[in-house]
Every structure is written in C-alpha cells, then in structure tokens.
Amino acid sequence: MAAPGDPQDELLPLAGPGSQWLRHRGEGENEAVTPKGATPAPQAGEPSPGLGARAREAASREAGSGPARQSPVAMETASTGVAGVSSAMDHTFSTTSKDGEGSCYTSLISDICYPPQEDSTYFTGILQKENGHVTISESPEELGTPGPSLPDVPGIESRGLFSSDSGIEMTPAESTEVNKILADPLDQMKAEAYKYIDITRPEEVKHQEQHHPELEDKDLDFKNKDTDISIKPEGVREPDKPAPVEGKIIKDHLLEESTFAPYIDDLSEEQRRAPQITTPVKITLTEIEPSVETTTQEKTPEKQDICLKPSPDTVPTVTVSEPEDDSPGSITPPSSGTEPSAAESQGKGSISEDELITAIKEAKGLSYETAENPRPVGQLADRPEVKARSGPPTIPSPLDHEASSAESGDSEIELVSEDPMAAEDALPSGYVSFGHVGGPPPSPASPSIQYSILREEREAELDSELIIESCDASSASEESPKREQDSPPMKPSALDAIREETGVRAEERAPSRRGLAEPGSFLDYPSTEPQPGPELPPGDGALEPETPMLPRKPEEDSSSNQSPAATKGPGPLGPGAPPPLLFLNKQKAIDLLYWRDIKQTGIVFGSFLLLLFSLTQFSVVSVVAYLALAALSATISFRIYKSVLQAVQKTDEGHPFKAYLELEITLSQEQIQKYTDCLQFYVNSTLKELRRLFLVQDLVDSLKFAVLMWLLTYVGALFNGLTLLLMAVVSMFTLPVVYVKHQAQIDQYLGLVRTHINAVVAKIQAKIPGAKRHAE
C-alpha cells in the first residue's frame, strides 16, 4: 500500500461547478493537487508541459458559456492508496489491484448533486480509443477532436436523476445527441460487455475539462483478456515503476465472476490483494421529443442540491441496465450460473425504437390475444418482479426526492413498464439496452397517442374483469343483467375467452357464494349455465320459491324425522343420528303417558305390568333370567326364520337386525355428566329437606311430616311395596288420559276437595298456638 500523504497535501476548494479533481498517489510520492484552472508551481525535476495556459484558456471559455451550458457526466477514477480516503461516496465501482499498491475505482458522477469532500482523491477524463488504448484527453483541442467512433446512439434530454445500487449516480447533461467515444467498430460487442459509455457532447466539452498540469507519473494498465486500456497523461514523463492493475474480466464468464465491490473503508487486506471485478452499468437514453435547452444551474452555497428537474415538454422512455448485486440493500437479485453472458443477454434483450413503438401501437390487440390464451400462474407471478427491476431502487438516499420527481413528472415511463408484453418480452435478463439504429431516429408516436393506447388497454382489461365477475354472480344472484347493461360491449374473441375462464373461476368461488346447501352444483356449472338462460323469463315465479326452500329442507327433514320417532317409536336410524334416550326425553314421556301413540304406549305399559307381576311371584334374580331367555328365544327364532326365507327366495337382504346393530346406543361423556348433575341436585335437595324436618327447624313442617308417616303405616299394612308400585304405574298411565277426557268435571270436584281440605287445616291451626303464630 502507498504511504499516507503529508498533512500539507490538502485539497483546495473547487474552482467552478464543472471543475473536477485528479489525484493518484504512487509509492513514496507526495504530490500537491491543485484545482483545474489554477496554475500550480512546477516541482523540481519535472517539466512544465504548459497545461496552465491551456487551463486558463479553458477556464475563460467556461466562464463565457456558463449560464447556457451545463457540465456533462464524466468518468472518474480514483485510487484508494491514500490512507485518508473518504467513504462519502455511496456507490463506487472498484477494481482492486493484486500487488496491494492501491485500489482504483471508477464512477460516473455529476458535480451538481455531490459536492466533493476535502479528502477525496480522484481524476477525471474523457476516454478516447486510439489503436486499442484509451487515453485521457489533456487539452481542449484534443477533446474537441474525437477519433473514429461508432454510430451515434439516439440521445434523450433527461431531466430526472437516475440512481441505482450498482454504483452509478448521474445527472445527464443537456444534450440532444449522446456519443459513445469508442474507436474500433469491430470491437463494439466486446467493449459493450464491460466498458462504460461515456455520455458527453463533443462541441461542448471544451469548457468542461481543465486538467491539472502535474498529473501522476504512473501508467495504469487494465489487462483484460481482449483489450489493454492504459491511461497515459500527455506531456508527463513515463514513470520508472508503473503500478499495473489487473482485472479478470472475461466476456464469456463476466456475469458469473462479477462481484459488487464493498465500500473503500471496509476493504480488508485479502480483499485489496484479490482482484474484484464488477460488471458495469449500461445506461442508454432515447430521445422521444426534443425540448429547449435549459440554462446552466450555478452551484452556490445556498443551492448545492439543485439537480435537473423533469420538464413537461419531454416524455422520456428510459431503460436502465444494472448488474446483479447480492448486497442486502439491493433489489437486484444476484446472477446465477444459468444466466447468459453479457454479450448474449445484450443480443437477446436489446430492442430498437421501431420495435418499441410497434409494440406500443399493438398493445390493444395484444391484450385481447392474451385474454384468449391465459398465461400460466408462474408468468403472472413473475410480473411484479419485472416491474420491481425496472423501477428505481428503494435504498435510502439524499437524492430520493429528486428521483421521485422524474416519476411524478413523466408518467409515461411507468405506463410503458406496465405493458404486459413489453415487460416480460423486452426484459429477459438484467441487461437491456436499445440497439444502435443507423441514420436519424424514426419519428416516435406522440405522448398523447401512447397515453390513449395504454389507457384504452387498461380500460379494456377492467371491463373484461367486470364482465367476468358479472358472469360469476349470475349463477347465484339476479344482478348479472344489470351489470351487463352497465358494461360496454366486448369483442367476440374476448367474450369467448371470458366464457372459458368463467367455468374455472366458478369452481373456485361457487362454494363460498352458494354455501354448503349445493355441494355438487358448482361442478356442473359450465354445462348448466346456458340452461337457465332461456328459462329465466317464464320461470321467474317458479325459481323464487325454490331458492328459499333450500335452507328450509334441513329443518323440514329434522321435524319429519322427529315426528315419526315420536309416533312410530325407535326405528333404524343412521350412524350419524343422535342416540335415542328412552324414558329420558320429557316430550317422549309425555307422549307415552297421554297415549298419543297407542301401539308404543301399549308395549311399554304391558312390559311394566309383566315385570311387576313377575316380581310379585318370583325373586328379582329369577325374573331377570326368565326375561333374558324369552328375549333370546324370540331373536334367535326370528333370525333363523329370516335366513330360511332368504334361502328359499334366493334373496340377499342381509342380517334382519342389521339396522339395530348399527344403531348407536352408547352414552357420551356429556350426557352422562348431564344426568349425573341432575341426579346429584335431587339427592342433595332431598338430604337437606330431611335434615330440616328431622331436626325440627320448623315445628309445623315437622308435624306435617309426622302425620304423613303415620298414614303410611296404615297403607303398608294393607298393601305390599310391589303392589303400591304397580298401582303407581297403572295410575301414571291412566290418570292423564282420564283427566284430559273429563277435565271440567275433575276440576270442579278438585276445587271442592281443595276447599274442604283448607277448611279442616284452618281449624287445626286455630287450635294449635304455634301453628297460628306461624300462620300470622
């Protein structure tokens, strides 16, 4: 690495808005740097090439043409050999040397937007290719005489600031013609892959460059596989020990070996020694409509951040080619091994202005063709990525407000990028540029024509989406005729595409719109869609009562299932039906007691009577055994009978008790918990009441309970417990029916009995002092 400079080697302030600095430090060399346009004192042992006079002449020429011209973008190469290199440059394009003497980085910088730092060291120059070498122009006369160059690229007068993650921050100059100053046309494809396009204007560069009279005595040889680029100052002697900087730029593997150079201050020793190759950025500007040149904006202390503003007169169409950047803050994805090289991607992705204008004019027709052939999901998902690549970077920058002004001022750039065919076909990779067109550029379409075409395309897409939604809603509601009247008529091809897409979308949206009531209707939607069309006018009255019947069908089925269950008793139910709770359902018990189903009530009543009479004659164990044998004899006999019948009739009806075998009779945990809680409540209430009566909490209640027990002694002497239970069962099945039939007479007699009982109780309470006091 080079030794750090002396403290006296400080950079002086800029001489003007277009002045640039040139400084490169060799090994052990300390050279003072002077601004351009000033006359430095020649050092000992070095001839004065007389550049001071020419610099003063260029300075006077610049002062005369200051307000009418503006400095172009210049290529700047700086050395990082100085220890105090500033890291203020946000984006640098660097190539590290092998021997570790110093790292050279090159960037395109506009001095209007970025004021130079006090410790920045770099040099500027306009490259011209002469016999395979690019030489820095040292005089205005040499700069004004360009060598053999390639065909001119159609220029554009861009007013916005374009910045990217790849290290390029530029403000294009006010020029109507952009020239690539490269000499050999045969080496065009080789040079375009990894060389900068110097954007300048030959007739206006004489006042831009005023070089320092004392340049570095070092020759930087960029040794590539194809070309050798050397920077040789005119009038300065050759150094004895040149510091070559080698870069492994191979055109076939340029994208695979390209890496993004980190900031200069973050470079480690290994990174400085290893060569780092960075893919350059190619920026091509195409002029659509020329406009009047604006005056040069002077950089004053009050207006240091003034940049070019977008003009309403121009509508630029800009295509920026960026190298892949794998840094976290970059939106450009890194390149992979499968991507094509720079030359291949440029040949495939470059389009001319004729093709661009033709694609814009055919945008409306392409929109309908794409509607007929819907794109796969992968291409539709890649569209936001393409738009993200073509858009400006999202990293924070002090010039973001200037970059946003270009977007807000010229909306045609965003509209052109939104073209579905141009966004996917014209941007296959990260490197895209307009091809060279010989002769004058063709007359492009006016901004109003472009805007009208794009607007019609967007409106056609919106109308097609509206009609698709209308067709989807027509199957579930009656709002489709209204929407079709509001929407404009479409072409037959678009309508056919809509009909094809309607079936696919209906399968996805029908379950959510129609509900679970029609599980299989949306599957037959394409075939059943044309059928209700002709039947809709005469069948409006018939369709309206059917649609509300759909949610009512489950309710009717449930009610119909409950009524036969109550009338016909327990029958074969499905496996998903709730388990029958015999004698536990209140409504079912009421139906049994009131003989609403005579057959079912008779079976239950006879079973109880048989059980009770059996218990009166036999013990409980004998009754259980006899009942089990009777049930088994009945079921076995029926099973054999059905089997013989099926064998004779040669039928296969299956098991005769199959429905009962599949019937779910298990009690769930919730049901058991429910009845257990109910039983617990009654048991606890009974225990509390008995405790209160036996402990004479209330004397009257305890006396009543005593009288009841005295009467039960007489009942027990007359009847057995089973007889009482039998009488209770008979009364339970007979009294409700008798009460319903003779309710009026029974109520009358019950009223008389209640009155007589109340009178007797009142007399008893009058004779008992405690009872009277309690009644008061």
From Swiss-Prot:
What does UniProt note about where in the body, tissue by tissue, this protein is expressed?
Expressed in neural and neuroendocrine tissues and cell cultures derived therefrom. Expression of isoform RTN1-C is strongly correlated with neuronal differentiation.
GO BP annotations of the record are:
brain development; endoplasmic reticulum tubular network formation; negative regulation of amyloid-beta formation; neuron differentiation
- Determine if Metal-binding is one of this entry's keywords: no
**Basic and acidic residues composition-biased segments:** 497-511
Question: What compartments host this protein?
Answer: Endoplasmic reticulum membrane; Golgi apparatus membrane
One Pfam family this sequence matches? Reticulon
InterPro entries noted in UniProt: Reticulon, RTN1-4
Q: What does this protein do?
A: Inhibits amyloid precursor protein processing, probably by blocking BACE1 activity.
Q: What is this protein called?
A: Reticulon-1
